[in-house]
Design a protein with these regions (language model features):
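Conserved N-terminal phosphate-binding loop of PLP-dependent enzymes in the Aspartate aminotransferase
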Residues: 1-421
Length: 421
């Protein structure tokens, strides 16, 4: 079957709202390689949108899921619990940068984790208000759309959204937004929109994902912690995209001398299986009444088995160090490309959470057109890239951290040629 034929069937069978980026269909995948139904080979620098830090079908993940498949596939943890859920919670509690005793609850999607973090924060504080940041992305449910600071394509035509959500400014040195500017935006919210004693939580991504891989400065993160402590506000770190070795640490918050009260996780937690979680201070996590948290598929045993294997692989294969090594090489290649590609305005990131931003050299304005061209040319040469950014003018790199050196070098050669051309 040809991809063109299958695309016609897709258009007839599925709604246009489920946007599809690639015009080919995958048949098989292994580590950092995809093969489409026509036999073409693609180097995967998207990894299912940051889900495959341990690669496609890592043997240890596959083996763990296969073993669980022979035991049981579903009971609903709230009905009949299982040890693997408890032991995974224990592992996350030990690993997460939470101050004091921690507890963890598992869910299915990143948006579901954020929704439950909001429920927990409101239950603990008895307050309604939430502060988040422009450019942030937190999910596609109604509450998480309200929290998200990017309209297209996520929020168009879906309002009105839940209230008591306020957006501050996220620091961005490339665009001249300082930590002081960001903090002033919060002061204005407290003066104009909601009193601080009515705010349950401030939620942010330590590195914005969809927003363009903008890295929160250390002084900003410390100021948020101090602000939260002053007013009895909880600090929630959304680590859905940043977690599990992507940034060179198991969690991005470990780059800071700051500990959140709650932290959300998903994506690479379970190596391609749907699993998310919220970890936080035990007293905060215990605020909802029994039955207040859960879900039919929350903490599915197959996904939990995969997550145990993922944590083992990250430790055994030293993927945090690997992320630093690969990311450093990538940033070097991108910075060298600036000499021949005047559209590059910034190269940024931490570990292997790296991005390059493009502007029109003539006008200085964001150039989503050039960004799409880079993606197109890369795809023609067998390299799959993702874009992001409020203006769609950023390429983000989300390759598996298990990618072989030779394949990584090949991908960077393709990237360098595309940028030069």
């Amino acid at each position: 079957m040809k991809s063109s034929e299958l695309n016609q069937r897709r258009q007839q069978a599925t709604p246009r709202g489920v946007g599809v980026m690639c015009n080919y269909f995958v048949e098989k995948a292994e580590n950092a390689t995809l093969w489409d139904i026509e036999g073409n080979e693609v180097i995967d620098f998207a990894a299912g949108i940051a889900v495959l830090n341990t690669g496609h079908r890592h043997p240890k993940v596959v083996a763990a899921v296969a073993e669980q498949l022979q035991a049981f596939t579903h009971t609903a943890y709230q009905i009949v619990p299982y040890e693997s859920y408890v032991s995974l919670a224990e592992r996350i509690n030990d690993l997460a940068p939470i101050d004091g005793p921690a507890k963890t609850a598992f869910f299915t999607t990143g948006a579901e984790a954020v929704e439950n973090a909001v429920k927990i924060a409101r239950a603990y504080t008895g307050r309604p208000g939430l502060i988040t940041f422009g450019g942030g992305f937190h999910g596609r449910t109604f509450m998480t759309m309200a929290l998200t600071g990017k309209v297209a394509p996520y929020k168009i035509g879906f309002g009105p959204f839940p209230g008591s959500v306020y957006h501050g400014v996220y620091p961005n040195a490339t665009h001249g937004v300082t930590t002081a500017d960001a903090l002033k935006s919060l002061e204005r919210i407290f003066k104009a929109d909601i009193a601080p004693d009515q705010v349950a939580a401030i939620i942010l991504e330590p590195i914005q994902g969809e927003g363009g891989f903008n890295v929160a400065p250390a002084d900003f993160m410390q100021a948020l912690r101090d602000l939260c402590d002053t007013h009895g506000i909880l600090l929630i770190a959304d680590e859905v995209q940043t977690g599990f070795a992507r940034t060179g640490k198991l969690f991005a918050m470990q780059h800071y001398e700051v500990k959140p009260d709650l932290m959300t996780m998903a994506k690479s937690l379970a190596g391609g299986f749907p699993l998310s979680g919220v970890v936080g201070r035990a007293e905060v996590m215990d605020a909802p009444a029994p039955g207040g948290l859960g879900g039919t598929y929350a903490g599915n045993p197959l996904a939990v088995a995969a997550a145990h294997a993922v944590l083992d692989v990250i430790a055994e294969e030293q993927l945090c160090q690997r992320a630093e090594q690969l990311g450093s090489h990538l940033q070097e290649v991108l910075n060298q490309a600036r000499a021949t590609c005047p559209a590059i305005v910034d190269v940024r990131g931490r570990g292997s959470m790296v991005a390059v931003e493009f502007n029109d050299p003539q006008t200085g304005e964001p150039s989503p057109e050039f960004t799409r061209l880079v993606q197109q040319k890369a795809q023609e040469n067998g390299l799959l890239l993702l874009s992001c950014g409020v203006y769609g003018n950023v390429i983000r790199f989300l390759y598996p951290l298990t990618i072989p050196d030779a394949q990584f070098s090949k991908a960077l050669d393709i990237l360098a040629r595309v940028l030069k051309s």
